[in-house]
Swiss-Prot record:
It comes from Danio rerio. Disulfide bonds join C23-C49, C26-C51, C34-C52, C41-C55, C63-C76, C70-C96, C169-C203, C214-C225, C227-C248. In early embryos, expressed at a low level in most tissues with expression becoming abundant in the liver by 96 hours post-fertilization (hpf). The expression pattern in adults exhibits sexual dimorphism; in adult males expression is limited exclusively to the liver whereas in adult females expression is observed in the liver and other tissues including the gut, kidney, ovary and muscle. GO terms for molecular function: insulin-like growth factor binding; insulin-like growth factor I binding; insulin-like growth factor II binding. This is Insulin-like growth factor-binding protein 2-B. Residues 19-99 form the IGFBP N-terminal domain. Residues 107-122 have a biased composition (Polar residues). Residues 107-128, 144-170, 238-265 are annotated as: Disordered.
Length: 265
């Protein structure tokens, strides 16, 4: 998960705008273990606090919390008509679009810090989450809660109207958002140990779990990924947690992806 996008979840109308986060140093040893790029592309650092160089996503390509960064001058935005933009970003259904200028022009040093480029073995500089992330956060959280309030209002207005039940994955996501809103911050420092412990469920368009689930990158290493049952979110026994692609497509059509039986529930 991208730490920058995670920071965007914590900004509410600028009230937490002064919280500062620092990623661990990208040592030469960690960078030496990175896989070599075989194609020519714009190079950016891995999402979150990863240290390895990866190819940036280009304009119009899908992007989200778990994907690599967009290229220079681009940001990952949810669609304008999305009812739940935050969930769209978590599902990897955003798009890399031209960055919306919502803040004064940054200095060269601030721009380099914000771009996420690989900076040798130096520690990534301390930075404040930009206002463009605050913009995404405000839209996402406001629409998320407005949608919930609308469903509650419609149910009260007409008791006979069936209320769509949230899936297990959506309920789990709501709990994570609630935990974030209740987090306490002290001395203008973000409790990174708490943030890294957060487990964002990766839900698909229908509200079920995406087959591939991942932890956010920490300590210069990409987060572990694994395959789950789309109905329960439980890790498939034969699927190991790996720092890369767990190849979840191998389970398509297999019994591992079947809904649980009444006895299993």
């Amino acid at each position: 998960m991208s730490l920058a996008l995670l920071c965007s979840l914590l900004l509410v109308h600028g009230s937490l705008g002064e919280i500062v986060f620092r990623c661990p140093s990208c040592t030469a040893e960690r960078q030496a273990a990175c896989p070599k790029l075989t194609t020519s592309c714009e190079i950016v650092r891995e999402p979150g606090c990863g240290c390895c160089p990866v190819c940036a996503r280009q304009k119009g390509e899908l992007c989200g919390v778990y994907t690599t960064r967009c290229g220079s001058g681009l940001r990952c935005y949810p669609s304008a008509n999305s009812e739940l933009p935050l969930e769209q970003l978590i599902q990897g259904l955003g798009r890399c679009e031209n960055k919306v200028d919502l803040e004064p022009t940054m200095t060269n040093q601030e721009s380099a810090a914000h771009s996420g480029e690989v900076n040798g073995t130096r520690s990534p500089p301390m930075k404040k989450p930009g206002k463009d992330y605050q913009y995404i956060k405000e839209i996402a959280v406001n629409k998320h809660h407005n949608n919930k309030r609308t469903r509650m209002y419609n149910t009260q207005d007409d008791p006979k109207t069936p209320h769509p039940k949230q899936s297990q994955c959506q309920q789990e996501l709501d709990k994570v958002l609630e935990n974030i809103s209740r987090m306490a911050f002290h001395d203008n420092k973000g409790p990174l140990e708490n943030l890294y412990d957060l487990k964002f469920p990766n839900c698909d368009k229908t509200g079920q779990y995406n087959l591939k689930q991942c932890h956010m990158s920490t300590h210069g290493q990409r987060g572990e990924c694994w395959c789950v049952n789309p109905y329960t979110g439980v890790q498939i026994p034969s699927s190991d947690k790996v720092r890369g692609d767990p190849n979840c497509s191998q389970y398509y059509g297999g019994p591992e992806l079947e809904p649980p039986t009444a006895q299993q529930k």
